[in-house]
From Swiss-Prot:
It comes from Synechocystis sp. (strain ATCC 27184 / PCC 6803 / Kazusa). One of its GO terms (cellular component) is plasma membrane-derived thylakoid membrane. GO terms for molecular function: oxidoreductase activity, acting on NAD(P)H, quinone or similar compound as acceptor; quinone binding. InterPro entries: NdhM. It is found in: Cellular thylakoid membrane. This is NAD(P)H-quinone oxidoreductase subunit M.
Amino acid sequence: MLVKSTTRHVRIFSAEVQGNELIPSNNVLTMDVDPDNEFVWNEDALQQVYRRFDELVESYSGEDLTDYNLRRIGSDLEHFIRDLLQAGKVSYNLDCRVLNYSMGLPKVENQETAGKYWLDN
């Protein structure tokens, strides 16, 4: 039986890819990162996500393979990707089909306003 978790930027399936098909498996998890290409990735950032995925899967070793457990892993990965975005390790893809800034508005450094705050009275 295929068990899956789908978040905005991470899709996890209890299956392996053969050709263009997902073949259900109780022993293999397959992850699709950022299927809508919302972000610009470098190889290092992508590898960090894969390593974090491996760590999370290992932490559930011995647990039942359930939708709930996969959703928890997917949710943790969403937070991890947000951390990468906020650290500047990935950025929004401005050529994406739809710009929705699902992880928050981009922050642009401006030398003239750095460290200054305005209060409207």
